Design a protein with these regions (language model features):
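Bacterial N-terminal signal peptides that target proteins for export
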Residues: 2-13
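C-terminal motif of bacterial Sec signal peptides marking the signal peptidase cleavage site
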Residues: 22-25
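Bacterial signal peptide processing site
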Residues: 27-29
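Von Willebrand factor
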Residues: 34-178, 234-236
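Acidic/histidine-rich, surface-exposed loop or edge segments in extracytoplasmic proteins
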Residues: 34-51, 192-201, 283-289
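Surface-exposed cleft-lining segments at the edges of enzyme active sites
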Residues: 192-211, 251-258
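A Trp-anchored, charged/polar loop motif used as the substrate-binding/catalytic surface
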Residues: 206-226, 261-269
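VWA/integrin I-like adhesion module and closely mimicked acidic/polar interface patches used
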Residues: 242-302
């Protein structure tokens, strides 16, 4: 079962699929496609350093939040259109299924923004301008860690100044600027909340329920693919991969690996967890095996376990 935060987020994605619209600009058909999804899972337990794990993936997170979040509703140089990316952040810790989840974009606003420019005779150029402007203003704020709020007055001023030479109509520009500010404010506030949450929780978790975190992502992916089978989904696991629930627990990584070949055990656990929705999606394991202390051989076995779990090439 999902918690209510996940359920609301997934209902929103389903709604975005229903609301996807085909619109025309510059004589060509433009489609705001349903959203794609980037999932990030960060380990808060003390078997690895949460700060190091977050630093390892943060550049990729920022790229997801800025360069991919508006999508591309037009075909460009023969490349197909694609939907906006929804970035979701969850955690490994004690009872991972019940830890907080952050959805970092208000992607429904992207549809609304597209509606504002879709009837423009230069819709594709307008969308490219909005996308580049959004990226250039949002990225420095996120690189700074979302350490300070982004006041509405400053947001409106920045976007208006950047767009006034391209969108000469005052009312049109005001409507676009308002929507862009809603999106930027939402993302900066959520990102700041994410950074603060990591700082608060990183020393609070002595156990690491990796399987619980993966099962929760699997449920979310399953729901997305049900509504949009063509969705591009990416999962990044920023964890050392050690599942530790309690002393002598049968699902501890050490107990599992003691039962036989690490690769075979990974394949067996994949079937037991019914994680089939994760088969075939893009999975990255930047922190797997990064255990603290003198555990090189054990870390290597954990790395092997997870690569076989996800059927990844070496």
């Amino acid at each position: 079962m999902w918690n209510t935060r996940r359920a609301r987020g997934l209902c929103g994605i389903a709604l975005a699929v229903v609301l996807s619209v085909a619109l025309t600009g510059c004589g060509k058909k433009a489609v705001m496609l349903p959203p794609n999804a980037d999932f990030y899972v960060l380990d808060l337990s003390d078997s690895g350093k949460a700060e190091d794990q977050f630093e390892r993936i943060n550049q990729d997170v920022l790229r997801s939040l800025t360069r991919n979040s508006l999508g591309q509703p037009f075909e460009v140089d023969g490349e197909p259109a694609y939907g906006p990316t929804v970035t979701t952040f969850s955690f490994v810790g004690k009872n991972s299924r019940f830890l907080k989840t952050f959805q970092l974009q208000d992607y429904e606003k992207v549809n609304q923004l597209f509606d504002l420019v879709s009837e423009d005779t230069r819709a594709q150029n307008s969308w490219d301008k909005l996308t580049s402007t959004y990226q250039s203003i949002l990225e420095p704020l996120l690189i700074a860690g979302g350490s300070s709020p982004f006041p509405q007055s400053l947001c409106l001023q920045k976007f208006d100044s950047s767009l006034k030479d391209y969108f000469s109509g005052t009312q049109t520009r005001q409507d676009l600027v308002e929507k862009l500010c809603q999106m930027a404010t939402y993302t900066t506030e959520k990102y700041r909340g994410l950074v603060n949450y990591i700082a608060e929780e990183k020393s609070e978790h002595k156990t690491s329920d990796v399987f619980g975190a993966i099962e929760a992502v699997n449920n979310s992916v399953q729901s997305i693919l049900k509504d949009n089978p063509a969705a591009k989904i990416r999962l990044t696991l920023a964890t050392d991969g050690e599942n530790y629930l309690s002393p002598n627990n049968a699902l501890n990584s050490s107990s599992i690996l003691s039962q036989g070949d690490a690769c075979q055990q990974g394949q067996v656990l994949f079937e037991k967890l019914s994680a089939k929705s994760l088969r075939g999606i893009d999975v990255e394991l930047p922190g797997i095996g990064a255990l603290l202390g003198d555990k090189a051989e054990y870390a290597g076995e954990i790395d092997k376990f997870w690569r076989c779990f996800f059927a990844l090439s070496k």
